[in-house]
């Protein structure tokens, strides 16, 4: 960990996560607010689920392509946790990424709050349970939505695969959009604890907020269990791979590395 923290490239990656997360939350939540200027007194807030889902998915795909070669473009604590459990990043990197992601989400939500201050009852896209949905059901939706996302990340960035064509960022972006199409009517679709955290902090409303951390983290852990130990087990011993948690990857910034266990890279094969 000590050697990793001294590298400029490490801190560039952390800054990249912060900046990309700020842009992601601003663009995606901005689209979810669902109102047009100038505001009219009798205007109703109509949320187009397809528009919002595409905004979330396309923003992830664009930003993953933009900063993937710098940080891996996690942009989601659940994805970061998944890659940590998959022994692809160190504990230090995971902690710093999650902090950067949460701070980025707060900054973006603060900017949105200022821009949309004239909007009455502005929730800033805060996640909560829909009417008639209990906490257990909401938790289940968040688990499933995040599971399919992290499973997609692990599969599309697996260096052992030689059958991949096209764009990994686009595939992951579509997975994010798919998760929103599933979950948006039940929980507002979290599947990203940092995104949920930013809105909750600015609105000072943490009602049912635990669901949007616990659900995605459970879904992420399940995705790693399914992919790394059932669908595509790795040949290297798990105890050896765990060394990455403290030492990091030696070649983690080598974009042309051939190591099948090296860092996730949001880059077309």
Swiss-Prot record:
**How would you describe this protein's topology in the membrane?**
Multi-pass membrane protein
Q: Which residues lie on this side of the membrane: Cytoplasmic?
A: 1-11, 66-68, 83-90, 154-163, 225-269
Among InterPro entries, the record links this protein to: Aquaporin-like (IPR023271), Aquaporin_1 (IPR023274), Aquaporin_transptr (IPR034294), MIP (IPR000425), MIP_CS (IPR022357)
Gene Ontology BP term (one): glycerol transmembrane transport
Q: Which GO terms describe its molecular function?
A: ammonium channel activity; carbon dioxide transmembrane transporter activity; ephrin receptor binding; glycerol transmembrane transporter activity; hydrogen peroxide channel activity; identical protein binding; intracellularly cGMP-activated cation channel activity; nitric oxide transmembrane transporter activity
Question: CDD domains, per this entry?
Answer: MIP
Q: Name one GO cellular component term.
A: apical part of cell
The residues on the Extracellular side of the membrane are 30-46, 110-133, 182-186, 200-206
Protein family (similarity comment): Belongs to the MIP/aquaporin (TC 1.A.8) family.
Self-association and partners: Homotetramer; each monomer provides an independent water pore. Component of the ankyrin-1 complex in the erythrocyte, composed of ANK1, RHCE, RHAG, SLC4A1, EPB42, GYPA, GYPB and AQP1. Interacts with EPHB2; involved in endolymph production in the inner ear. Identified in a complex with STOM. Interacts (via the N-terminal) with ANK1 (via ANK 1-5 repeats). Interacts (via the C-terminal) with EPB42.
Q: What is this protein called?
A: Aquaporin-1
């Amino acid at each position: 960990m000590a050697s990793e923290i001294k590298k400029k490239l490490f801190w560039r990656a952390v800054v990249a996560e912060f900046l990309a997360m700020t842009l992601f939350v601003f663009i995606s939540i901005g689209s979810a607010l669902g109102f047009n200027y100038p505001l009219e007194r009798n205007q109703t807030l109509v949320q187009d689920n397809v528009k919002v889902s595409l905004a979330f998915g396309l923003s992830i795909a664009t930003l993953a392509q933009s900063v993937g070669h710098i940080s891996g473009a996690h942009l989601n604590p659940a994805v970061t946790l998944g890659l940590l459990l998959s022994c692809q990043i160190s504990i230090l990197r995971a902690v710093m990424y999650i902090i950067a992601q949460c701070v980025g989400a707060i900054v973006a939500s603060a900017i949105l709050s200022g821009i949309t201050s004239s909007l009455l009852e502005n929730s800033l896209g805060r996640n909560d349970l829909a009417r008639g949905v209990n906490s257990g059901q909401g938790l289940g939706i968040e688990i499933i939505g995040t599971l399919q996302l992290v499973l997609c990340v692990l599969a599309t960035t697996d260096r052992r695969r030689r059958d991949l064509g096209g764009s990994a960022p686009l595939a992951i972006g579509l997975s994010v959009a798919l998760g929103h199409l599933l979950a948006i009517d039940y929980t507002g679709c979290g599947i990203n604890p940092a995104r949920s955290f930013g809105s909750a902090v600015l609105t000072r409303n943490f009602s049912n907020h635990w669901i949007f951390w616990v659900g995605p983290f459970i879904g992420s852990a399940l995705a790693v269990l399914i992919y790394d130990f059932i669908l595509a087990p790795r040949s290297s011993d798990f105890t050896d791979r765990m060394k990455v948690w403290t030492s990091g990857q030696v070649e983690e910034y080598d974009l042309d590395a051939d190591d099948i266990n090296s860092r996730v890279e949001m880059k077309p094969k």
